[in-house]
Amino acid sequence: MTRIVVLDGSLRPSAGNTARALSLCTSSFDASTEVDRIAVAAYRGSVGEMASRLCAADGLLVGTGTYWGSWGSPLQQFLELMTPYEATEVFFGKPASVLVTMDSTAGSEVASRLAATLVCLGCWTPPFGWMALSRAGVALAERAPEAARDVWSHADLPVLAHNLVVAARIPRAAFQAWTVERATPIDSPWPAAHSLPPAAPDFL
């Protein structure tokens, strides 16, 4: 069984566009793929428990909305708390794909920066391993499919899902890590993150 941890780093983890996009993506996983889904804004475990769940994963799927050109604050908090696990078995050598939602702009930049951040933690990105779904792009695909052939849409989610699972099933290569200034992990309760009520236009 291939285990994928799905992290929802958005501010509306229960009912937002990112939550729906992640659900659409994971619906393409085959029966041999087990999903451990974590809504970071609603997570109430400990830092150590979070690290253990990531450590048990064969791959990661990380989702977030776009907030003023960046990812959600719950995801930023996650990255800060997980920094002591940089280049450890929690992240090292694991494929990580990124799925970003946005209204109309900045999502591609957020996705590329997030993928690069995960690489610095020790992960690697599969082919076609990150994408940004926009309200504008989805609307275009619905109204003028020919004009939207080169714009990310729902139809691209199975590719992202397939490539992540294929990458997660590749035998772990003998990668090497450079030296990092390692912080000491703190196994404390996960700090409560704030979330937002539904407000952004739904498009998924």
What are these regions (language model features)?
Residues 1-87, 144-204:
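N-terminal beta1-alpha1-beta2 submodule of the flavodoxin-like/Rossmannoid cofactor-binding fold
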Residues 92-140, 152:
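Short, glycine-/small-residue-rich phosphate/pyrophosphate-handling segment
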